[in-house]
């Protein structure tokens, strides 16, 4: 029997982001159909099968971008028409408990107009699996350094 991985979603007027939380995923299989059907399946770290199918709110393009990280897989799916969806799924019922809003990627309509990165897909894929920054937690305080050298 297969299990459902946690799925986080966010949108822009022209695309939908789906983040599948599945560490060390193998044998990833994805299918995007123009009428809005998105299907995913993969094997987890212990070989267990994870899968889900979503009937998305609107029509989508069959091409998608995928970024496989250590802990998750991020999909950027192009909408057929530029518009803001009122929800992720076509069904008006409450979504399954494994589907949640990705507040880290979420952008409201008015924020997108003001944002220069609204069409920049790269921003969704940057530092998703990074555990540390380049500065190794060090903070540079030039005023303290000046005081110490006096």
Swiss-Prot record:
Keywords: Chaperone, Cytoplasm, Nucleus
Region feature (Disordered): 112-150
Post-translational modification: Phosphorylated by casein kinase 2 in vitro.
Keyword Zinc included in the entry's annotation: no
Observed phenotype of the null mutant: Short root length. Impaired cell division in the root meristem.
Record carries keyword Chaperone: yes
GO biological process, one term: response to heat
GO MF annotations in UniProt: Hsp90 protein binding; protein-folding chaperone binding
Family: Belongs to the p23/wos2 family.
Functional description taken from the UniProt entry: Acts as a co-chaperone for HSP90. Controls root development through the modulation of auxin distribution in the root meristem.
Protein name in UniProt: Co-chaperone protein p23-2
Species for this entry: Arabidopsis thaliana
Gene: P23-2
């Amino acid at each position: 029997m297969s299990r459902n991985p946690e799925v986080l979603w966010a949108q822009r007027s022209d695309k939908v982001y789906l983040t599948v939380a599945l560490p060390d995923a193998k044998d990833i299989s994805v299918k995007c159909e123009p009428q809005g059907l998105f299907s995913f399946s993969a094997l987890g770290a212990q070989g267990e099968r994870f899968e889900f199918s979503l009937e998305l709110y609107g029509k989508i393009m069959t091409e998608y971008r995928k970024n496989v990280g250590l802990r998750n897989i991020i999909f950027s799916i192009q909408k057929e028409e530029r518009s803001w969806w009122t929800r992720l799924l076509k069904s008006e019922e409450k979504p399954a408990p494994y589907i949640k809003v990705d507040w880290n990627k979420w952008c409201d309509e008015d924020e997108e107009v003001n944002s220069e990165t609204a069409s920049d897909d790269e921003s969704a894929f940057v530092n998703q699996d990074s555990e540390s920054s380049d500065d190794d937690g060090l903070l540079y305080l030039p005023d303290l350094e000046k005081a110490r050298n006096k």
